[in-house]
């Protein structure tokens, strides 16, 4: 059992037990995070190895917890940039072994404005700097990651236009990602 999670999650396990005993069908998800602007401390679950470690702990404790998989945050944690774009697909492939623990997908666009990248704006075209080959490779990898016929919760955080939101949904549909 990965001991580094015990001090952080043991405090909330009693709350988890209370919720699950009263509302058995409730899905509880834990999201990975890696914020460059967050100043309140370090996140426990940011990288692919940390996500896999958490899933091993969930399994060892026989918990019905799952992951809300924030894909852009994973890329931030691994410092994936357009120059290191080969890692985009490799990271998704690496997480295939724990996909049964992924209960939700958090995805958003990103676009350039006044020489800096703005999160939660734009669609996947602008997220990948209009590199359609890279976007297609990402969507293909995402489709393979989730080719297990499991329906997942979809959390889209797009603060720009509804066209951007619809564009992301259309891309996910084309990739064969099943979601609610």
Give the location of each predicted region.
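Short, surface-exposed amphipathic charged segments that create phosphate/polyanion-binding patches used
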Residues: 44-46, 122, 169-175
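Hydrophobic faces of well-ordered beta-strands that scaffold small-molecule active sites
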Residues: 5-7, 28-31, 65-70, 103-107, ...
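Gly/Pro-rich active-site loop or hairpin
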Residues: 39-45, 75-151
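Active-site beta-loop-alpha junctions enriched in small/polar residues
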Residues: 3, 10, 33-37, 72-76, ...
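C-terminal helical cap(s) of enzyme catalytic domains, especially alpha/beta-barrels
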Residues: 162-180
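Active-site acidic/histidine proton-transfer and metal-coordination neighborhood
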Residues: 1-66, 168
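A structural alpha-helix within SAM-dependent methyltransferase catalytic domains
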Residues: 13, 17-20, 96, 143, ...
């Amino acid at each position: 059992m990965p001991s580094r999670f015990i001090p952080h999650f043991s405090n909330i396990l009693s709350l988890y037990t209370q919720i699950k005993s009263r509302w058995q069908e409730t899905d509880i998800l834990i999201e990975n995070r890696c914020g460059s602007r967050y100043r309140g401390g370090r996140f426990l679950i940011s990288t692919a190895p940390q996500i896999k470690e958490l899933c091993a702990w969930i399994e060892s404790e026989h918990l019905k917890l799952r992951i809300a998989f924030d894909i852009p945050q994973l890329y931030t944690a691994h410092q994936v940039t357009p120059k290191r774009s080969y890692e985009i697909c490799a990271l998704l492939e690496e997480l295939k072994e724990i996909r049964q623990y992924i209960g939700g997908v958090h995805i958003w666009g990103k676009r350039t404005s006044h020489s800096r990248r703005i999160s939660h704006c734009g669609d996947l075209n602008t997220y990948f700097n209009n590199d359609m080959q890279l976007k297609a490779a990402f969507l293909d990898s995402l489709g393979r990651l989730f080719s297990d016929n499991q329906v997942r919760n979809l959390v889209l955080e797009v603060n720009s236009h509804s066209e951007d939101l619809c564009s992301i949904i259309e891309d996910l549909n084309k990739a064969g990602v099943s979601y609610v």
